[in-house]
C-alpha cells in the first residue's frame, strides 16, 4: 500500500476534520482520481508519433491509455472527425496513490527551474490541474528512447467542495505550492 494513502488515513483525515470542523470522516475531502492527458496533434501526419506517445503514457501511468479522437473536423488544423489526436488515462485506487507518490517525490523535483506550483490552478470546486512540459521528468521514461519531448496535463480530482478545502488537502501531502 502506498505510504501517502497511509498518511491520509492516519494524519490528514484528523487534521482536516479539526481544521474545517467535520462531524463525519466521509465529509473529509479525498483524492478521487488523477487524470493524465497528452495532446498529440502531430499524430495526424504520422501514426508512429501516436504509438510512441501511448508507449510513454503507459510507462508513466502503469496502465494503457485510451486514444482520444477528434470530435469534429477543423480544416485550419487539417484534422478530420475521428482522427486520433491524443491519449488519456484515469488512475484510481492503488495506482493513483502510487502515481501521486512518484509525482511528489521524484517527478516534480526533477522539473527544470522549478519554483513551486501555482495555487491559482484550482477550478473552483477543489480540483487541481497542472501542466508538465516534458515527460522525461518521470523515471520510467528512458531519455535515449524518446523521439521527442512531449508535455501532458495532470488533473487531480478531489471530493472537496471548494478551492480552500482542496488546497488544504494537497497542502497536507506537502504539495509544493508557490509561497
From Swiss-Prot:
Keywords of the record: Ribonucleoprotein, Ribosomal protein, RNA-binding, rRNA-binding, tRNA-binding
Any one GO molecular-function label of the UniProt entry: tRNA binding
Keyword Acyltransferase: no
Xref: InterPro entries: Ribosomal_uL5, Ribosomal_uL5_bac-type, Ribosomal_uL5_C, Ribosomal_uL5_CS, Ribosomal_uL5_dom_sf, Ribosomal_uL5_N
Gene3D superfamilies per record: 3.30.1440.10
Cellular component terms per the entry's GO annotation: ribonucleoprotein complex; ribosome
SUPFAM superfamilies according to UniProt: RL5-like
A Gene Ontology biological process term: translation
Pfam assignment, any one: Ribosomal_L5_C
Keyword Electron transport (UniProt): no
Cited function: This is one of the proteins that bind and probably mediate the attachment of the 5S RNA into the large ribosomal subunit, where it forms part of the central protuberance. In the 70S ribosome it contacts protein S13 of the 30S subunit (bridge B1b), connecting the 2 subunits; this bridge is implicated in subunit movement. Contacts the P site tRNA; the 5S rRNA and some of its associated proteins might help stabilize positioning of ribosome-bound tRNAs.
Matching HAMAP family: Ribosomal_uL5_B (MF_01333_B)
PANTHER family for the chain: 60S RIBOSOMAL PROTEIN L11-RELATED
NCBIfam families, sorted: PRK00010.1
Family per record: Belongs to the universal ribosomal protein uL5 family.
Assembly information from the UniProt record: Part of the 50S ribosomal subunit; part of the 5S rRNA/L5/L18/L25 subcomplex. Contacts the 5S rRNA and the P site tRNA. Forms a bridge to the 30S subunit in the 70S ribosome.
Name listed for the protein in its UniProt record: Large ribosomal subunit protein uL5
Species for this entry: Shewanella amazonensis (strain ATCC BAA-1098 / SB2B)
Protein's gene: rplE
